Amino acid sequence: MRMRTNWIASKNELRAAGLAVAALAMAGCGSAAPTPPSPPPPVTVHGVAIREPLVDPRPYGASDTAFGLDVLGAWCRSDPRSNLVLSPASLASGLGMAYLGARGGTAQAMAAVLHLPASTRQALEAGLQARSAALRGLDGPGVTVNASDQVWADPTLKTLPGYLNAVATGYDAGVAQAPLLSSPDRAVAEIDRAVAAATHGQIPQLLTPGSLNNVGWVLTDALYLNASWATPFEAAETNPGPFTTAAGQQVSAQFMNGGPYRALTAGGWTAVGLPYRGGKLAMVALLPPAGAAACTMPGAAALGRVTAALAAGSPGVLGRSVALPKVNLKVNVSMKSLLTGLGMGVAFTHAADFTGLSRQACCIGLVQQADTLRVAEQGTTASAATAVGVEPGAVFLGPHQITFDRPYLMLVTDSATGEPLFLARVADPTAQ
């Protein structure tokens, strides 16, 4: 039986807005409306959150991994010499909240790019609820994981009750008012303050002044991670060593040395699992086959099997020492062109259909993500913020030590569900 919780509503249609480290901005179709009066103080409301029967979140972890690899591969091909970091979990949450308002061909295109499992809307919301609960259940001794989702809406626009119910059920997201149409830069400041708080100050600015012109809704997801290694690296064992960058230059990087860690090879890739305290989370460092093309990515299904084998210590997994560079990565990037290239372009045009969100919603005008990832001797600190803006109308392992001395990938994953919290490509560990 589906159980209803967290009911807060106003009349038949709620006027709302929300927050998360991943934000989506949406615009409405038609001519621009007159400048509305200043909105009342911010009010946050929730729809009817349906407590769904417990389902397996792992298919959604697999979906987000496939989506994240697609995005990272496309991004790398457009910028093969730079360090790249993204949060598939955060980006999928921001876009997933938009998907819940999409209909027709727009929904089909978004589902294909997001690799969403084929299901009914009710089953989808149940799966998203299980995924969200798993993410929020990763906290433990030595590990802090904070995930939050929010919808921000201009108070002059009407958000459909059914949409509020869907985001409350799938993402535990509320809707908060912000003066997106009357004072967009003030709304930017409000959203940035919320993102900074949700990421413990790691992302002080997701959006910039002028970035929310003609945006009526912003869907945000925020994700923060601070995790200690199960076995920390000894600082005294960190030493300089050569690293050949994606540009073909040799630089001196600071290599952490430790082990043994579980390692295996599959399809020419060498994978090493570095668990965090408590065993719920792990980093998987992936060294591509020697001589592989610059932006070669592993297959999502194969990567899932590798991470599962490392977590379980399956036959073929051996102990190896590791030399892994320290890194400190930061990015803030628009994802629109990458998502368009992957097949989501209709969602950004006036042919889009977001009538499940509001009769006044037109299309996605903004997809922005900011990420930080710091890997050091004691553990990993990482954060992500995504904003989606919706516009209104108008097997041989080789040496016993595995040295990551050329461009490689890093994946921070939930060992139980396979949910990819962070995914990175290190082209030059000395660059920040």
What is the predicted function of each stretch?
Residues 110-114, 233-241, 294-305:
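Short Gly/aromatic-enriched secondary-structure transition segments
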